[in-house]
Regions:
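Noncatalytic linker/hinge segments flanking ATPase motor cores
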Residues: 89-95, 129-131, 172-182, 201-211
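Short C-terminal domain-edge/linker segments immediately following a structured domain
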Residues: 81-86, 117-120, 162-168, 192-197
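Glycine-rich phosphate/pyrophosphate-binding loop and the adjoining helix
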Residues: 187, 191-219
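Hydrophobic/aromatic beta-strand patches that form the interior of the parallel beta-sheet core
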Residues: 51-53, 88, 133, 162-164, ...
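Helix-loop-strand module that forms the ligand-binding subsite of alpha/beta enzymes
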Residues: 99-187
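Solvent-exposed loop/turn segments at secondary-structure junctions
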Residues: 57-60, 92-97, 138-142, 167-172, ...
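N-terminal beta1-alpha1-beta2 submodule of the flavodoxin-like/Rossmannoid cofactor-binding fold
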Residues: 2-7, 13-129, 141, 211, ...
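Short, surface-exposed alpha-helical segments at coil->helix boundaries
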Residues: 69, 73, 77, 144, ...
């Protein structure tokens, strides 16, 4: 869905990506987006309890074919390993179709309906986490609706939230500012956008991009 979920609609100026995103090969492996972040990025990670929560879809994806592990999950696992975090995979109770086009259609309808799909399980003792990394692919120019379900499910007051996403050409598509607005009582730091194809096929580049980004955040 990242292509349909990531295409630029020339008539509406809305990024319409279908389900994990589209872009030409680029020398830029990752980009830190700072517009939605505060001027100081000091998460004070020493001794902090950290969670990496992410939505990611395997099966048929744009630009990478049928995959066993979603692009965003790959990045999430690198982050969790680097910072010593717990992980939570945001999964819907009703699975998305395995086929790319079919999944795109479902995702587009959910977005039109402003749906909040029910998600499986939950984070135990969410209140214990000081820092939450929040990851997702770009679907139709936005976060998957299940990510909104996740944000609605917990109190993020006084937590540090650090977004990251995968895409195939649309970057972060304004989602970091959206998170800042959606979670006004959280401190949202600089995010990282990385191409899904890079995450799938260039592991060393992806790991280095994650390390560089985390270094810049003070981890």
């Amino acid at each position: 869905m990242q292509e349909k979920l990531n295409k630029q609609d020339s008539n509406t100026e809305t990024t319409t990506e279908k389900t994990e995103d589209t872009s030409a090969e680029s020398e830029v492996v990752s980009e830190a987006v700072t517009d939605a972040a505060p001027s100081e990025n000091e998460p004070a990670s020493d001794g902090a309890n950290i969670l990496v929560a992410y939505f990611s879809r395997a099966d048929e994806n744009y630009n990478v074919g049928t995959i066993d592990k979603g692009n965003t999950q790959i990045v999430a696992e690198y982050i969790a390993s680097e910072v010593g975090a717990d992980s939570f995979h945001i999964e819907t109770v009703t699975p998305y179709p395995a086929g790319y086009d079919e999944c795109c259609d479902v995702a587009k309808q959910e977005q039109a309906d402003k749906a909040r799909p029910e998600i499986q399980g939950g984070v135990e003792n969410m209140e214990q986490y000081d820092i939450v990394f929040l990851g997702y692919p770009i679907w139709w120019g936005d976060m998957p609706m299940a990510v909104y379900t996740f944000m609605d499910s917990y109190d993020f007051s006084d937590k540090v939230v650090i977004p990251f996403n995968t895409h195939e050409g649309s970057g972060e598509s304004g989602t970091y500012s959206a998170i800042t607005s959606y979670l006004p009582d959280a401190q949202v730091l600089d995010g990282m956008a990385i191409q899904g194809k890079t995450a799938q096929e260039f592991s060393s580049d992806t790991q280095q991009a994650v390390r560089d980004w985390l270094d810049g955040l003070g981890f």
